[in-house]
Amino acid sequence: MTNTFTFNAKIKQINSHLPLFPENLDSFWDKEIKPLFTDESLSFMVKTLNGNYVKYVNLDNGATTTPFASVKQYVDQMLDTYGSVHRGSGQKSVITTQEYDASRNMIRDFVGSSSQNYVIFAKNTTEAINGAATLWAKKPGKILVSDIEHSSNLLPWITRDEFVQYRTQPDGSVSLSEIENIFKAHHNRSKGEQIKLLTITGASTITGYRPPIYEIAALAHRYGAKMFADVCQLIQHERVDMRPDDDPCHLDFVAFSGHKMYAPYGTGVLLGPKEFFDSSYPYQIGGGNLPYITRNLEIKRFYTERAHDPGTPNAMGAIAIAKSIQIIEALERSRIAQYEHSLVEFTFTRLQNIPGVKVYILGDNLAHVIPFDIDGFDGRLVAEILAQEYGIGVRAGAFCTYEYIRKLKNISDEQDLEIAKEVETGITRNIPSIIRASFAVYNTLEDCDRLINAIAQIAKNGFDYYLPYYTQDEITGVWTVTDR
């Protein structure tokens, strides 16, 4: 592995919101990270084009993460006692219900939530935000949403409700003064024209940029609005604190997913005030969450979290999140953040020195993601080469953040119009794309070195070198290995 002394010397000059990791990185990984995952997951071997097998490097952690070994083991054990939740008096039902209910309290503590907030489970973050957006659409006022949002925190709001979109800076960063100007412009209007809710990502899925969510929350509250934070790209890396309700910087709503924080089975979580959720019927209704219907079809309802659990819930997903939280807390999120940040700074510094490589990232706001391109290459081809020839998993695409990628790639209005016309005919190959390497706590300096060396070799070879070996689909733009 890379010499840690050399590593620390190289990244000393870069300013950061986090200090460098104070421990030896290799030692920390060997002693504290490696035991948390199965040997099979850490030593997963893949076959490359030359026929050799290499250890897989997972740098697509912004999409999903490998589960903790003890989470997997615990859930497997729980399956032996698995029973219906809130639906039976048998021992298996009681055991599963107790574990499921306890997971809510653990999640509430994990994000510093008030006891006056509900913890509502969903299929994923997308469904959680859709649920919140559906309920907010019943209330007068407008949603304030940024132009750097993932589609999951954009489409649910703009397709259901009146909205105002605020434009971020050319690099995707937020201007508090410009946000305040929007609040001021709407503040003295009628109730239906005022801003009722501001929603924003906690960390960008494409660059890792972290807007100042607590300062933004204070600004929203100053003008009588609520604050919604999509923290699914943040919570596994750094502490998210909703804060007490009387704190001007408190977050009124947060949403995230378990599968991005080392918990399998894909459960999403939505937290927000009881009074908000009790003020209307739940987003989804059905068996169990509305306990009685009279002969005259009068509906009697719960005013509890259970009102938002229609049907049989994904109990194993909720329990998996709770167990993952225990491990993350024991490891300490500040150490996770510093460790991952050190890997990113090391990789960032080296990639910048490779001729032909462009890194789309704010140098003083490095997080867990490095977005980049190689001159002359389609990003999707680079991702395919990394997988097929080097056993490295990254992702290339627009990452459902279309306006942000247009900013980063300087896509003109005319180009945007042409792309849109093509998409209407089913052609998606020219949708702009960027390569994203996204890091997790199980990544190592060796992973960083393998990525850096692979990118250097690809850039050196040049685009034409790969044309005989890879073919691009005329419609989708996807690259595949040419039959040989």
Residue map of PLM features:
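Pyridoxal 5′-phosphate
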Residues: T2-R484
